[in-house]
């Protein structure tokens, strides 16, 4: 019954367009069906057609599967919609020209889902952002797509691909900040540039802004932004640790922000012994009074730039989870896991997570599900080869 599958059971279907129709795939293997209607946009003789298609079975006949552009353009359905080879090619050429902003947003979401499900390569997605985002004016679409871009860049590219794309991506963001972006979009590109910056040129640019250099037209920063810039600079250039500390302590007047800054900053130290001491302190309940600050420390300790040195923290992060649940806020176990695992992409960490779950077959189900959810990116990375 509709109520049983939608309300009383977990999971969601994967919806994939095939030559002989629309497949609804239940990844649990139970062959469940989620009855629904989707809005399919397809290309026929140069004309973009849209039609409502009811899905009532594991396979629904559909004649135009090979020319589908957007599997659910009006966002009526529920599930993971996978791009087709045709939709990838079409969006590669036309995404920035689509007039309907909803369809553009759906196109970006579809391509990002394609990266997560190995239908689209991360490098392709990054290049598509550089190609099509300059034409995008809608702030919601820009923000959403830049969040996808940051995720793909930090998680779904190998180190070699990251290095190959680094200069182009920095130039793109810098150009959008200084020249092409409009209004609120400038700040979105500025924040993305800060999160991905690696070159000495861009780091020097950010250091200048922290120290009072003139901001690009249309960009404003507050004390929270200054602290974020300081954290990123301390992470990327350990020689600047004391310099940025001194600048923040001298220029920021808000006591709450300064207290947070002083609490979190040691987690960015270039000295691993200092970082180890910070991590070990977080394992002691008395030091976890401010759980938001704790999660921020843990996130910096396990930042992608420190992921190799931080791998040894992972077993203890998992091992502390029961205590975290017993002593913390109801939401703290999830934020603890997200901060501790999201920066890691190695097969070694994936093995650590699987080993932990295998060694604890009777682990509380709610915590097991949180571990699986926060290590899902690792499962996606190591679940097979990309098809494009």
Please provide the spans of the model-predicted regions.
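Non-catalytic accessory/interaction domains
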Residues: 1-388
